[in-house]
Amino acid sequence: MNKLSTKLVVAIGIGSALYGILGLWGFSIAPNTFIKPALAILTVFGALFGPVAGLLIGLIGHTLTDTIAGWGIWWGWVISSGIIGFTMGLIQKRVGFSVKNGTYNKGDISYLAITGLIGIVIAIIFAGAFDIIVMGEPFDKIVIQVLGATIADVIVFLVLGLPITIGLAKSNKKHTHLKIEK
């Protein structure tokens, strides 16, 4: 593994703190399941800094949320946040894509949307399976949580995460179609 740069470590720290603190707020939709706008942090930071940053922000941030909330650390859900962050960061590996430089195309946006949605589904199914197998949670409760969490995360990703990331990229474009009139 390559050494983590100071900039990347700082980004992971800031992203983890934001994700961890913002993860304390949400709107309940099922037992212990919330629509949490904090998921947008994983999208933005993953797209800005890549899959390793997304993974670590998800893992550290979710652990922070669970610790501060006092309900104990639910490792399946912590790992699922890491998976989501990792998949959101895969976009940064595409040649020509850069939120920082404002370079992207429709294919990049489609790629982010698809990898993000796939990542959410895989991560939430993993968390549910982990809760059933390792934590001994009842199957019927977990089905409701998995469905609720998947719907909630998809909504936050499509309504906040994706548009914010695209907006940042657009605002960082180095050129415009404006022309100076003489």
Curated annotation (Swiss-Prot):
Superkingdom of this protein's organism: Bacteria
Subcellular location: Cell membrane
InterPro entries, sorted: ECF_substrate-spec-like (IPR009825), UPF0397 (IPR022914)
Coiled coil (UniProt feature): none
Bilayer disposition of the protein: Multi-pass membrane protein
Main location: membrane
Cellular component annotations (GO), alphabetically ordered: plasma membrane
TM annotation in the entry: 9-29, 40-60, 71-91, 114-134, 142-162
Keyword annotations of the record: Cell membrane, Membrane, Transmembrane, Transmembrane helix
Family membership noted in the UniProt record: Belongs to the UPF0397 family.
Record-linked NCBIfam families: PRK13661.1
Name of protein: UPF0397 protein BCE33L2384
Native source species: Bacillus cereus (strain ZK / E33L)
